Amino acid sequence: CYLIRDGQMKGDHIHLFEKRSIPGGACDGCQYPGIGYVMRGGREMDDHFEVMWDLFRSIPSLETEGVSVLDEYYWLNKADPNYSLCRATENRGQNAHTDGKFGLSDQGCMELIKLFFTPDEQLYDKRITDVFDAEVFSSNFWLYWRTMFAFENWHSALEMKLYLKRYIHHVGGLPDLRALRFTRYNQYESMILPMIRYLEGHGVRFHYNTKVTNIEFELTEGKKQARTICLLVDDEAERVDLTENDLVFITNGGCVESTSIGSQDQPAVFNPTLRPGNGWDLWKKIAAQDEAFGRPEKFCSDPEQTNWMSATVTTLDERIVPYIQNICQRDPFSGRTVTGGIVTARDSGWLLSWTFNRQPQFRDQPKGQLVGWIYGLFSNTPGDYIKKPMRDCTGKEICMEWLYHLGVPENQIEDLAEHSANTVPVMMPYITAFFMPRAVGVRPAVVPEGAVN
């Protein structure tokens, strides 16, 4: 989009290689035939995503003629501001009464302040546990922060510091998420589709079902030139030759790589294998050519520490709705804000959080149904009602665990999960790979030293 708008490049000079049959990457939202609605994750946005909103001021709305996606987004959140009436529960759906408090001691506050002002180089390869102790980890602040951003205790202290600095304006709104903004529908329909229509309208060429398996560089003293893009197109090998006048933009790695999708009756398999065409495999092959291209193994070598799971739940009738409404204290069918961001079951073995955004979440969503999202930070610990790890659970079993934490009577849980909901689990082995401890040089520069194209 920037190449077209700001770079004045002709659209038919731009080629996008996409390994899936649809675009959007992690910004997804679709209905799989025979499985149901699936959203792997969601975007928590705010007023200070300046680059993003600068882009969407130029992307026309698909719903309202003559206005931009940014216009729609601004008007929507002005008329229906986001905030939560219940940020956390405990004891099976009871308000945890965090009551807007951070619960930080003086020592905990000092640990946060010290981290904020620590030079980056002193945090290289350090974990969050190296800079915080129980004064922070037992606080409401850490509950709010870790579940909002999906930080684990073993993640990078440097990344924690960078997030604190980038989202300092969120701190006051952490207890009720009032700094967040959301789109009308799921992220794919509200953001990706308008962008794709804009690009298609300018003649950009999309190549779907096309895996990039390698990019071969010619390396000479002080110069790195991408010479060939190696492709698998419907499993047939192809090569695209490049010149110094071409520009190559690479997605190195990827948080939703090796994703597996289950169903109401099947678990989502944990399979972190890196195959040709996978973003991590591609980055490894590029990095093997020169150290300036980074060290992907720092991020993708321990999927046990970079995974979590989500599930998309669709209510099929009215029986679950009162339990949702009891917690969020709003009418889920109003078309306005429902939970106002995630609700965390703070005493959940999976550290389960869930949310229902404005309904319908999909344009074709049947009337009378709700589509929500659940995620668990701990995929390998037993549940509280379902006594096995989340990664081993079917969609129905994940729904049962969620219903337990909503406060549904135990003698109704299985019936509601089976007949009143459809739940689709998703396992993402590398979803927090970018949070792993790191040092300088592990991530390549946006334009690596000596790169010419």
Residue ranges and their predicted role:
Residues 4-31:
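Glycine-rich FAD pyrophosphate-binding loop
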Residues 34-75:
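Conserved FAD-binding subdomain of flavin-dependent enzymes
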Residues 165-247, 252-253, 265, 271-280:
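Helical element adjacent to the flavin cofactor pocket in flavoenzyme catalytic cores
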